[in-house]
Amino acid sequence: MRFPEFLKEHGTIGFVAPSFGCATEPYYTAFAHARERFGQMGYHTQMGPNCLVDKGIGISNDPALCGKELNESYCGTENDVIISCGGGELMCEVVPYIDFAGIAQAKPKWYMGFSDNTNFTFLSATIADTAAVYGPCAAAFGMEPWHPAVQDALDLLCGKITRVHNYDLWEKESVKDEEHPLAPYHVTEPVELKVFPQGAENVTMEGRLIGGCMDCLVNLLGTRFDHVKEFQERYKDCLLYPSPSPRDRG
């Protein structure tokens, strides 16, 4: 399996919008502040043509144009890693326009996004045999202050950490809105890990973690993009994680 190089000091972070872009508030201001933060940290940023566009239905633009943006950004040399602008609802319409054969031949890059971006992060692994990150989208990096999960996401792209873990609290209701675009995660609920079957102790497992948003995974079942069986036959160590659909698209 192909694992991309980590983001280096003064490297370039690219942004694409194969699902929602950051054309409206609170995402517009949060995305602008995220780019400012990255610049202060010494990174360069590069935006695809759809990042600030709101012409599509459930996505930033026409599906063909969204696919073109993703293909060119991934296969091009203008950036070193890619972070999606946001989640959404209809990235499934972009999937037929993604050149997975070209991506499999291109130099691998870390791609990070969540929710609707399962349509790329999951298929990047199962079709193009290239690892990707199910993690926060671009606007999240505009929050003040950064939640540890946001810092960990960047550190993961940079290779500064090689392990991920739970946090003490999770967000049930976001307080980010048009008047508070830089609000951090509103974490109020304690994390509770439940093991099934009940009563089991010291559960450990090892394998290759793949998965994503449940809605997206269900939509891919049985289509020409469903290569899970072949992926399982190649590696025989798959651990599937389903994620509920988050309400916050960014």
Question: Model regions: which residues?
Answer:
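Gly/Ser/Thr-rich loops at beta-strand to alpha-helix junctions
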Residues: 20-23, 86-91, 115-119
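Short, acidic/small-residue loops that bind anionic groups at enzyme active sites
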Residues: 100-123, 131-138
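Short Gly/Thr/Asp-enriched flexible loops that form oxyanion-binding sites at enzyme active sites
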Residues: 87-103, 124
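Conserved small/polar residues in nucleotide/adenosyl-binding loops
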Residues: 241-248
